Amino acid sequence: MTAIVGFDQLSKALIDAGTNLLSPPSSTDDLLTLLDETESLLKNVEQDQPLSMQSALIPSRNALVSVDLLSHPDSDVRVSVVSCLTEIVRITAPETPYSDDLMKEIFRLTIEAFEKLADASSRSYKKAEFVLDNVAKVKSCLVMLDLECYDLILQMFRNFFKFIRSDHPQLVFSSMELIMIAIIDETEQVSTDLLDSLLATVKKENQNVSPMSWSLAEKVLSRCARKLKPYIIEALKSRGTSLDMYSPVVSSICQSVFNTPKVHSPVNTKEHEEKLDLGHSRKENLSKSSSKRPARHETRGINEKEKVRNGNKSSLLKQSLKQVRSESTDAEITGKRGRKPNSLMNPEDYDISWLSGKRDPLKTSSNKKIQKKGSGGVSSLGKVPAKKTPLPKENSPATSSRSLTGSLKRSRVKMDESDYDSDSLSSPRLKKLASCFRDEEPNQEDDRKIGNSSKQTRSKNGLEKSQKTAKKKPVVEAKIVNSSGKRLSARSVAKRRNLERAPLDTLVPQSSKRKKMVSQVAARQLANESEEETPKSHPTRRRTVRKEVESDGFGEDLVGKRVNIWWPLDKTFYEGVIDSYCTRKKMHRVIYSDGDSEELNLTEERWELLEDDTSADEDKEIDLPESIPLSDIMQRQKVKKSKNVAVSVEPTSSSGVRSSSRTLMKKDCGKRLNKQVEKTREGKNLRSLKELNAETDRTAEEQEVSLEAESDDRSEEQEYEDDCSDKKEQSQDKGVEAETKEEEKQYPNSEGESEGEDSESEEEPKWRETDDMEDDEEEEEEEIDHMEDEAEEEKEEVDDKEASANMSEIEKEEEEEEEDEEKRKS
């Protein structure tokens, strides 16, 4: 009951304090006293407060951002207001309590409050020290990156170097160090001004002038060495300055070769610490100060005695975990930090034990914070409170920046794909964070099983491909093959579904070929990747690593062939044509159906060869289980031409499909023949009209004659078209009759055969039926080829007849024109 009463009393006291702040007293001393009372009440509020406590905080939250308090003329009042506001930010973390504009104003006042650290005798010094420690623990400074307050960040760095003194406690030094390291680690691009302030502080001429700022800058540079190395080298080259002008830390950073640490591997703590300090004699360990802090600043869930005993190990672990995050900046993308407000704000890292003495030490809001963020933004490893986790072990120097893979984004840098074992992650927060890593990169485990750690990337066309993903047309990979290699009807069903699901603006493929899967893998490892690569500003896509097969014969033989290229990120095939092959690079140039092109090493890709050139319409008609019987087609033709063609053959399940496909092929040949005849006739008529216009004079009478001739030509063309259509129909009927006669010869007495087949089916084995089906298919293909040859011959005959008819018509027209001219002249 005492806890409940205390909770109610705290809520009531907060409401009264907020109400009083809404109408602040005119006296500065009374206002400072009221702000101190409000701050002490806010310190007793934990993060996971119930709804009643949230309601009790509303008056204070609104009163603290009033114009009267934020713009108060007394600087001590403003510092007290900032101290209360930092508590509000801590309570609501990781969510911001105010709008962006108000948060910018709060950060401006916070940096102004840091100026009070310059005078330890001032009234607001303790408040400024408390604000600094609170910002470092909660990491609310990272919200300034989200709000793009780069000027405020630069001013804060300069103030830290300006106001740090030797008489400051270790808490001030360590808090400044934590804030600066967090800012550098989480920014996507280190600004030139920020780097200049660091380098200017570690100049040798400033070592004796301001030794504390020198030491602070050295600490920050050594802790962020991997992140700052490319920027430092570029700055020194552009200015032409020598390394002798700066601290030995700068030269050590430029000459060092960084290795990729692995979280689950132990390391010697002494050697690791020596590498980070880079031989510097001044070793100010952060853990010594953290172990001496009051109980309110300790991490929840860890015994206070254990923290004092294991302070050094904990600080080194934090240091190594932050290096895991900072080492991935070799492939960093330049630009602004992605806007993820408050996602890096730490929850409260200390326990408020005096509110109710029965609080569970393991209760924290970190799990809730991770669930809220989801996949939108996972905080980096450097922000996880360090516990008894094994320290990282460095790899061999041959490790390159390409080994830093993964799409886990905070500042859009690539993380190491090392496996975070559950045994090595003792704290629940680290375990949850490792599970988020595994969810983000499910393909890394498959790549490790295959044993190929090299990642195939395409930086040339990667950005264009990612932008055109929605425009590319998917290719259906549904293939159902029986024992004889014949495709079944399920393929056509998959095509229909694909056409139904395709959007209206997507180009539906007009040709669906028989595909032959060719799965390949990279045959060699990337052995010369020890050098660090330049940061790239465009994304890359990885190819799925497949099992290794023989790659011989995939050179110039594939030029001109149609293939399907697998895109693992899109999880689909994209159709294209192999345009050329480079023997020197052993690369094929593939032109996709949407016009895009790229060079690929097909031995390292997953792709399919499209062998068959038949159209999608023909495949659909052939694969349909319900085909039109031959008798129905013959009857339709008999009605049209009034010819008696006796057809007594009823197709069985297999012969019916073959006969219907033959008839459909015949129809398609006839359609193509009609189109070609019409094109040739139109072309010849146009040529004849041009000749007539060239021969005639440019007189009005001759123009009238040409118009009359054109009208006559049109009537004659219509008559000629009717004659040609009759001839074509006759030729088609002849072909069908010849076909039916051949079938009658091959299958006489179809009824007897059907009965015989029923009896033979009981005796003959199944393998014989499959052989017969294969023989029938071969005969069918030969018949189709023969029919196509006949169609070509008929086409040539029709062309000859048309040519002779056109010549005779032209001669007649010329004679008639000459006679008309003679009559007119006479």
Swiss-Prot record:
Keyword DNA repair: yes
Coiled-coil regions listed: 770-825
Localization of this protein: Nucleus
Bias (Acidic residues): 702-724, 752-763, 771-800, 811-826
Primary residence: nucleus
Compositionally biased region (Basic and acidic residues): 269-286, 296-309, 437-450, 665-701, 725-746
Biased composition regions of type Polar residues, renumbered to the chain: 311-323, 396-408, 451-460
Disruption phenotype: Weak impact on meiosis such as formation of some chromosome bridges at late anaphase I and telophase I in forming pollen, but severe effects on development, fertility, somatic homologous recombination (HR) and DNA repair, especially in plants lacking PDS5A, PDS5B, PDS5C, PDS5D and PDS5E.
UniProt cross-references to InterPro entries, sorted A to Z: ARM-type_fold (IPR016024), Pds5 (IPR039776)
UniProt KW keywords: Cell cycle, Cell division, Coiled coil, DNA damage, DNA repair, Mitosis, Nucleus, Repeat
GO cellular component labels: nucleus
Superkingdom field: Eukaryota
Record GO biological process: cell division; DNA recombination; DNA repair; homologous recombination; mitotic sister chromatid cohesion
Comp. bias intervals (Low complexity): 644-663
Keyword Metal-binding annotated: no
HEAT repeat coordinates: 18-54, 55-94, 151-188, 189-226, 230-267, 424-461
Annotated spans, Disordered: 261-551, 640-826
Span of the annotated motif Nuclear localization signal 1: 281-288
Pfam families given in the database record: PDS5
Motif (Nuclear localization signal 2) on chain: 357-364
Subunit-level organization: Interacts with the cohesin complex.
Function: Cohesin cofactor dispensable during the meiotic division but playing an important role in DNA repair by homologous recombination (HR) probably by helping SMC5/SMC6 complex. Regulator of sister chromatid cohesion in mitosis which may stabilize cohesin complex association with chromatin. May couple sister chromatid cohesion during mitosis to DNA replication. Cohesion ensures that chromosome partitioning is accurate in both meiotic and mitotic cells and plays an important role in DNA repair.
Similarity-based family: Belongs to the PDS5 family.
Protein name: Sister chromatid cohesion protein PDS5 homolog D
Biological classification of the source: Eukaryota, Viridiplantae, Streptophyta, Embryophyta, Tracheophyta
